[in-house]
């Protein structure tokens, strides 16, 4: 019979979560199952992380290479929604939390756990994202945070690791809090908490200095129904597309973001992000939508995209509202197929060409040269009807002395 007295821990392999394994067992009396996902963050192999978890006292270690799943089911949804929270942030961390939560719940069911633990503090967004996502999938599971709920501070961690002779090699602590995956990289805390302090070179890893770029890089990205399927004529999966654009756009310094952000928990925070692949792909996707979406559909989608980004940022990935928006966004993508040519250089991703069999751009209607098929005489009647409400309202304003004033002096 499965043991229902276990805790599933979101395990990164670092000091915090390595200490948390034994600390949770000691404080709660429950065995701990460590869960680790590869979402393209780089660093140590899953096997190395698995063995460390077991050496630190985990009774089971559940590891998953989720890179393709993350790219296909999460990054592509963000791409189709042109997701940019507050106009600039491509939801680097926010879209990974629902995927991690799904695997935490799966592990809880598999190993008979009744509690899920994460390593978030009590003032960040991720605690909400994990716990709301977990509750949305299985509301019977309890969620805890050792840092928030059990007073597991860094000083306690170091002392605990020494006392219990845990197999952890402590390296010099970075002054920053960093979260990264294939969609991008988030950097915060340390001296960046003073919003007047400019970022230093050591903040960045995914991008080179845009002030000293190599020769410009021209790239052609082909989309099929909103998803990148080819780069420069070569077939790519979503994961391969993101990885290649990370390399190429990152080399040009594309995707550096520095902003004061409105957090879900109500405070403002200073955040740095690097998302070269995400920024380049979203720029290309938006331009293809400009060609392929009907005007009113496009206007509505821009509003929907903004709201989608806010909902996902605010821990609502699994909510009914987000699912409804997903259905609308997916329907808009059936004609978003074609090619976008971009130049990557000096921190910018600039579209220089676009073509699509499903484009609504009609050269014969748009041209001012011979061959123009647009009947300009039709504009007279259109303007009469379109301007009718304004003329009627203006007549009323004049009647009541509220007409728009015009300059009385004559022009010499």
Curated annotation (Swiss-Prot):
Its main location: cytoplasm. It is an enzyme of class 6 (ligase). L-aspartate binds at residues 121, 125-126. Coiled coil: none annotated. Disulfide bonds: none annotated. The keyword Cell membrane does not apply. Keywords: Amino-acid biosynthesis, Arginine biosynthesis, ATP-binding, Cytoplasm, Ligase, Nucleotide-binding. GO terms for biological process: argininosuccinate metabolic process; L-arginine biosynthetic process; urea cycle. L-citrulline binds at residues 89, 125, 129, 177, 261, 273. Its EC number is 6.3.4.5. It is found in: Cytoplasm. Gene3D superfamilies: Argininosuccinate synthetase, chain A, domain 2, HUPs, Single helix bin. Pathway: Amino-acid biosynthesis; L-arginine biosynthesis; L-arginine from L-ornithine and carbamoyl phosphate: step 2/3. It catalyses: L-citrulline + L-aspartate + ATP = 2-(N(omega)-L-arginino)succinate + AMP + diphosphate + H(+). One of its GO terms (cellular component) is cytoplasm. The keyword Isomerase does not apply. ATP binds at residues 10-18, 119. One of its GO terms (molecular function) is ATP binding. NCBIfam families: argG (TIGR00032), PRK00509.1 (NF001770). Belongs to the argininosuccinate synthase family. Type 1 subfamily. Homotetramer. This is Argininosuccinate synthase.
């Amino acid at each position: 019979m499965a043991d229902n007295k276990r805790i599933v821990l979101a395990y990164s392999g670092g000091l915090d979560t390595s200490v948390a394994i034994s600390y949770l067992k000691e404080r709660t009396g429950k065995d701990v199952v460590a869960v680790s996902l590869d979402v393209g963050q780089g660093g140590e192999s899953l096997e190395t992380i698995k063995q460390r978890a077991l050496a630190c006292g985990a009774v089971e270690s559940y590891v998953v290479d989720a890179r393709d799943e993350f790219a296909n089911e999460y990054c592509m949804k963000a791409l189709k929604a042109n997701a940019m929270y507050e106009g600039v942030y491509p939801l680097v961390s926010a879209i990974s939390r629902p995927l991690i939560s799904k695997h935490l719940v799966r592990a809880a069911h598999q190993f008979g756990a009744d509690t899920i633990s994460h390593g978030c503090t009590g003032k960040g967004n991720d605690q909400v994202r994990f716990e709301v996502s977990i509750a949305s999938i299985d509301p019977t599971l309890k969620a805890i945070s050792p840092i928030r709920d059990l007073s597991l501070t860094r000083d306690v961690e170091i002392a605990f690791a020494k006392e219990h002779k845990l197999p952890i090699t402590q390296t010099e602590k970075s002054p920053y809090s960093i979260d990264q995956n294939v969609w991008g990289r988030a950097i915060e805390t340390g001296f960046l908490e003073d919003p007047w302090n400019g970022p230093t070179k050591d903040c960045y890893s995914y991008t080179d200095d845009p002030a000293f770029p190599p020769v410009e890089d021209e790239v052609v990205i082909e989309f099929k129904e909103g998803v990148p399927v080819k780069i420069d004529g070569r077939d790519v999966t979503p994961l391969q597309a993101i990885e290649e654009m990370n390399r190429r756009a990152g080399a040009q310094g594309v995707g550096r973001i520095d902003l004061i952000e409105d957090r879900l928990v109500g405070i403002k925070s200073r955040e740095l992000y690097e998302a070269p692949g995400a920024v380049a792909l979203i720029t290309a996707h938006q331009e293809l939508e400009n060609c392929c979406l009907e005007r009113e559909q496009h206007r509505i989608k821009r509003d929907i995209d903004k709201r989608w980004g806010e909902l996902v940022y605010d821990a609502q990935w699994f909510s009914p509202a987000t699912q409804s928006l997903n259905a609308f966004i997916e329907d808009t993508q059936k004609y978003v197929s074609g090619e976008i040519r971009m130049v990557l250089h000096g921190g910018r991703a600039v579209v220089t060409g676009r073509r699509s069999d499903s484009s609504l751009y009609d050269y014969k209607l748009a041209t001012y040269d011979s061959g123009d098929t647009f009947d300009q005489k039709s504009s007279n009647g259109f303007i009469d009807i379109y301007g009718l409400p304004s003329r009627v309202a203006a007549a009323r304003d004049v009647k009541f002395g509220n007409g728009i004033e015009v300059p009385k002096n004559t022009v010499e």
